[in-house]
Amino acid sequence: MSDIIRLLPDNIANQIAAGEVVQRPASVVKELLENSVDAGSTNIQLIVKDAGKQLIQVIDNGKGMSDGDARLCFERHATSKIRSADDLFAIRTFGFRGEAMASIASVAQVEMKTKLPGNELGTLIRIEGSAILVHEQTAHPQGTSISVKNLFYNVPARRNFLKSNSVEMRHIMDEFVRVALAHPEVAFSFYHNDLELFNVPEETLSKRAVSLLGGSYREQLIPCKEETDFVSISGYIGKPESARKTRGDQYFFVNNRYIRSNYLHHAVMHAFEELIPTDAFPFYLLFIEIDPAHIDVNVHPTKTEIKFDDEKTVYAIIKACVKRSLGTHNIMPSLDFDFNVNVSGFTGMGLSDSSGRESNTNFTPKSFSTSDSIQRSNQSNWERMYSGLENNREEVYQESIKMVSAINGTEDLKQLSKEQLYTENTSTFQLHQKYIVTQVKSGVLLVDQQAAHERILFEKYIGMLQNRFGSSQQFLFPQTLELSAADFAMVVEMEEDIRKLGFVFNVFSNTTIVVNGVPSDVKSGNEKNLFEGLIEQFKQNRTDLKIDRQENLARSLAKRSAIRAGNKLSLMEMNSIIDQLFACKSPNYAPDGNLTVVMLDMDKIGRLFM
């Protein structure tokens, strides 16, 4: 039998390697920016078109390359960073494997221009699919310019797996911010489709953090510093009140290399224990300096995971450093931070008409089999129980309805008729400022005021987004919001839908918007927090749930603008919630799947006393 094992051609081997190194446009951005930093650049420019699918270009003023090095850098495992295996444990540069340029050139059309200081002419190389098309001398300033065009042009399957431009831009933005944060001594600029997104000069770390992450951190940064013989910690943490419900602005850098570490993240979270809610995440920007001999950076294709030879010691030092910084700045434990906006969404006692909406409002993520003790109602045509105020109530039912009945999880659904629900002199009151209790003929209805209001608002906002309307209340004094670049890009992307909800705002700068109005049913006084909360909730939902953008926006705004447990309600407000809930298409469940209402029938209540 003849031999069947063959050596792969270089171009195929490079494409296989590119599968690990070049996963999306952001991977190319990361590699090129890090190469520019390694070259000693003091000014780096990133130019992107079509979210990197059409063009990624990085221009720097680093030391450049000779003609021979320029050609050799496109060969696999060609690097200037290491000479022996021992060098792997003394690495302080970003690159060292010699795979990036060969991998990129195998799946894109690449042009490089580079020149050493003192040389009259530089080198021009054009390469496609690992094949060199042009190699000649050219005029060029000191430094290097690399253009990567039509990424995955020769691998259609890979290109088809790329996400939308907004998603790919978010990943590019993340990579840019990480490199720029790690090197405040370098000036960076970033352009997308000829629009300048960033232009940050050489500056201090605190100023760089504010420039990249948003002005909201200007007054929130707490210095964090610890020196030991084993490791040094420096950087900033955020005040507890700046903690958010989403993980995003948390950065670890080991010897200036961005890493991910759930273990070290836990050290920071432990230090913030009892200062922030358990579901909130603090800001931190921490730099760990350690002898390269004590770490291994060669354990992950993207080098974002590393191994410490004594991880427990690093954990303990980080935890102690953060705790000491919090104590030094007199941050005392507190358990009353409220990250949700308390606003009222009452628009009057009339019922909202949801019959004309074409929307997926029957969102019920909790699934039960027929054997479950609690089953969801299939009825979507709930009619209001009451109309008007307590002395003018008139039930308007066109058909029977189904109501969840759940006492200790033992009751199945019960069908209640108009006669069963009707009772004279109905009494309604609030229980522990959390539940609305109202009497019906067959027993008592318990309504979760927050869950019910979220359902009401969710269906209302879905209608606004799909029917393109939304009334606003204008501000006498507009409010300015400074956002991170990623949040700003997200707001611009969703601008049309956000306006449909009733928000009125203008773009002031690359990271600043001016809010002139909010939805008309939002209680005044919390406008800035509401907009910021909407963004945070949207990001949290995007991470945790697989839902489309409009549903996410509607759920996010409903979550942030619904009344909260602990809010005292008037009788009018309680009746309004009940009326509007029964007018919803899916009144049984809040958008997150939690029950909005349960019924305690008299038979079950009676048996509790036997």
From Swiss-Prot:
What InterPro entries has UniProt attached to this entry? DNA_mismatch_repair_MutL (IPR020667), DNA_mismatch_S5_2-like (IPR013507), HATPase_C_sf (IPR036890), MutL/Mlh/PMS (IPR002099), MutL/Mlh/Pms-like (IPR038973), MutL_C (IPR014790), MutL_C_dimsub (IPR042120), MutL_C_regsub (IPR042121)
BP-aspect Gene Ontology terms: mismatch repair
Which CDD domains does its entry note?
A: HATPase_MutL-MLH-PMS-like, MutL_Trans
Q: What domain of life is recorded for the organism?
A: Bacteria
Q: Which Gene3D superfamilies match?
A: 3.30.230.10, Histidine kinase-like ATPase, C-terminal domain, MutL, C-terminal domain, dimerisation subdomain, MutL, C-terminal domain, regulatory subdomain
Keywords on this record?
Answer: DNA damage, DNA repair
The keyword DNA damage belongs to this UniProt entry's keyword annotation? yes
Spell out the molecular function terms from Gene Ontology.
Answer: ATP binding; ATP hydrolysis activity; ATP-dependent DNA damage sensor activity; mismatched DNA binding
Which Pfam families does the record cross-reference, listed alphabetically? DNA_mis_repair, HATPase_c_3, MutL_C
Q: What does this protein do?
A: This protein is involved in the repair of mismatches in DNA. It is required for dam-dependent methyl-directed DNA mismatch repair. May act as a 'molecular matchmaker', a protein that promotes the formation of a stable complex between two or more DNA-binding proteins in an ATP-dependent manner without itself being part of a final effector complex.
Q: Which family does it belong to?
A: Belongs to the DNA mismatch repair MutL/HexB family.
Protein name (Swiss-Prot/TrEMBL): DNA mismatch repair protein MutL
Q: Where is the organism placed in the taxonomic lineage, from the top?
A: Bacteria, Pseudomonadati, Bacteroidota, Cytophagia, Cytophagales
